[in-house]
Every structure is written in C-alpha cells, then in structure tokens.
C-alpha cells in the first residue's frame, strides 16, 4: 500500500466513529480529495481481497472498519465488541 493508504488505514483503525473524507484529507494537507479517495480505494481493495476479518465500508457520510457480517453473530455472543484504545 502507498504511504497515504497506510496513514488512512491507521487513522481509521484508531477512530471510534466513521471519518469523513474531509477529516481524512486533514491528515495530509498536500493530498487532495481525489488522492484520498484513491487511497481509500486501495485500502478497501486490500481488505476485500486479503482474507481479512474486517472490511472498510462507507457509512454515515464517512469511512469505518467493521467486522465482516459472517462474524457478527459470534462477536455479539462474545460481548467484547469494544476494543481498548492505543495512543
């Protein structure tokens, strides 16, 4: 992945809510909206084709990592869906 895609991946992973494209653009002031959207597509494709348990989705006017639907029931049963934060 490109450096920008990795930066977006890290920010989205750390976020507790969906992040808008404008918020993601603020991570790299030199990157315009088109560049950020291309990097988001790169991250999304990486997670779509890599056999991961999470996926990058566009929801609520923003982007967020979510567990794949096929794991939702097991995660709900385990009752540990909230993960601890790292700074």
Predicted regions and their residues:
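A short acidic, leucine-rich amphipathic alpha-helix
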Residues: 21-26
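Short capping segments at the starts of secondary-structure elements
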Residues: 11-20, 31
């Amino acid at each position: 992945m490109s450096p920008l895609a990795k930066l977006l991946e890290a920010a989205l992973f750390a976020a507790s809510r969906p992040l808008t494209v404008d918020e993601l653009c603020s991570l790299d002031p030199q990157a315009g909206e088109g560049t950020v959207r291309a990097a988001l597509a790169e991250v999304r494709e990486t997670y779509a084709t890599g056999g991961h348990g999470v996926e990058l989705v566009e929801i609520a006017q923003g982007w967020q990592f979510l567990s794949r639907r096929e794991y939702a029931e097991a995660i709900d049963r385990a009752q540990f869906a909230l993960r601890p934060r790292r700074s």
